[in-house]
Amino acid sequence: MTDNAPITFDGKRFAAHLSTAPGVYRMYAADDTLLYVGKAGALRKRVASYFNGTPKNTRLTAMLAQVVRMDVTITRNEAEALLLENQLIKSLTPRYNVLLRDDKSYPYVLLTREAWPRIALHRGPQIVPGRYFGPYPGMTAVRDMLNLIHKLFKLRSCEDSVFRNRSRPCLQYQIGRCSAPCVNVVTHDNYTEAVHRVTLFLEGKSDLLAEELIQAMQVASEHLEFEQAARLRDLLTSLRSMQNRQYVDGRAADLDVLACAALSGHACVLLLSFRDGRNLGTRMFFPKTNGEERTAEILSAFVSQYYAEYPPPPEILLDQEIPDHTLLEAAFSRSSAHKISLRWNVRGERAGYVELAVRNAQVALSTELTSQRAQRVRSEAVRQLLGLEGPIKRVECFDISHTMGEATVASCVVFDAVGPVRSQYRRYNITGITPGDDYAAMRQAIERRFRRAVEEDKQGERPDVLFIDGGAGQLAQAKMALNAVGVESVLLVGVSKGEERRAGHETLIMLDGQELHPGAASPALQFIQQVRDEAHRFAITGHRARRQKTRMTSKLEDIPGIGSRRRANLLKHFGGLAGVKAAGQTEIARVEGISTALAAKIYASLHGLSKNDAANASRVS
């Protein structure tokens, strides 16, 4: 249902024609920008409340002044409206909603499902067969967990392509963090037992694991296997030491603790997670707010958005009562396998957890505001150094990374006045240039970035300053790229490495040839260094990933008759390109979809042989 009034919007009239059913409403500005998404138990009553009387605050006044149309979606119940509201807020990011800003998916511990399971950190879609434990509140918690598992249980962490082609144990075995299943140092039965123990450990069943270790230790002693008994004893001692450090609740609770702090128009929500009584650590969120929301409203928005994406534990402790808590409990319980309880005003040990979360939220917010103030000072110093008229709202920096021209990747990082905007980072895989031609790579990356902005008319995504990691030559290429797509209003600055590549001695190069030497103590240069270093980091990580993928697949892709499916079958069968290269023609021909003739072609291509040489080799293999 839509009212298409071109200039003014009659909210009362629109509301009068709405249903009393539950649903979701959306408010739009004249340029079709989505201003706000909300849910309602009764659409008519909720929408009418915006237009009856004076708005409660300046934020609401400013928003309603921009509304030119609304539309609604009716749902079967209010819980369904809540879920739809969360989906729309996350996907459409309305200007006036409290937005949970988190650019990264949560980390999990992955235990793969194969003959010799691998354990590893995992982020992103869960497409690898195996069991996923988590999510954990942060990377530190996962790395600490994996560190402990490798030390105690010695499971492998290597990729299959490495595992299947080892001829001797790797360094992880030498330092006591892997049992070397790749070369059968450990028996399959013993490795499977270690996997079982890791599973108990990750499930939080440490008491059960301890009982099993005690029984196994007794059996080993009875059979006079004293070395095995000693290893089990040491494992049990380490496990108990870990329990004493990490367990804070003997009743082994699964719960999250949330607290919200707000100051000077900014907010921090702190999440403290416990699983099976074990403290998994904290994670801080800094939601985008409009400065006038109460902490209870911010916390309510966070809870609804966060747990719409991640499974909630049975118990969630809050530092205060939040709006719609009953509705949230019902919606979460309906989508979970257990009842979800939101609690505040708790006592005893749980009150201590809440107090700890509140204190940490306040400290985190104070630290963040201090960091933002310092960043604004540096940003202002850049403005003054470069002679810009207005404040800097957005800067970008490009960098190129490759290895002798292989797998060239360009990065583009984005900063605003208070720090990095990671959700807008971009990488560009460079193709169609002479390998190692950094000038052509830079020109291609900048053209691709700005051509899209021009085509989509995204003026707000154009930077005030575009930093180029390089000297006058790179700067000239960047200018050519901008001219090619018709962009003229962007200030270009080259960042040339200093004498002996020492930090603090960088030279800033302008298009007119002017050189600036701010010096190591300059706040402006500190800001520029941060941006440049981030561009370099982002480029090199992208390059390494592309190089690894290229080395795994490109040689096979160049062979006529090898498509994506056959290539995948080969890599899966042999565990990687090295395994394919080590195989004989007869072995290659056993792979699904590979004929004898194609196997000969593959063997010849990978070994640089002629057809006759390949035929002779086939008789040998």
Curated annotation (Swiss-Prot):
GO BP: any one term: SOS response
Molecular function, one GO term: excinuclease ABC activity
A single GO cellular-component term on record: excinuclease repair complex
InterPro entries the record matches: GIY-YIG_endonuc, GIY-YIG_endonuc_sf, GIY-YIG_UvrC_Cho, Hlx-hairpin-Hlx_DNA-bd_motif, RuvA_2-like, UVR_dom, UVR_dom_sf, UvrABC_protein_C
Lineage: superkingdom: Bacteria
Keywords associated with the record: Cytoplasm, DNA damage, DNA excision, DNA repair, Excision nuclease, SOS response
Residue ranges constituting the UVR domain according to the UniProt record: 207-242
Gene3D superfamilies recorded: 5' to 3' exonuclease, C-terminal subdomain, GIY-YIG endonuclease, UVR domain, UvrC, RNAse H endonuclease domain
Pfam families: GIY-YIG (PF01541), HHH_5 (PF14520), UVR (PF02151), UvrC_RNaseH (PF22920), UvrC_RNaseH_dom (PF08459)
PROSITE patterns: GIY_YIG, UVR, UVRC
Ranges where the GIY-YIG domain occurs: 20-98
Keyword Cytoplasm annotated: yes
Localization (cell): Cytoplasm
Signal peptide: none
Similarity comment text for this entry: Belongs to the UvrC family.
Record function comment: The UvrABC repair system catalyzes the recognition and processing of DNA lesions. UvrC both incises the 5' and 3' sides of the lesion. The N-terminal half is responsible for the 3' incision and the C-terminal half is responsible for the 5' incision.
Quaternary assembly: Interacts with UvrB in an incision complex.
Name of this chain's protein: UvrABC system protein C
Gene name tied to this protein: uvrC
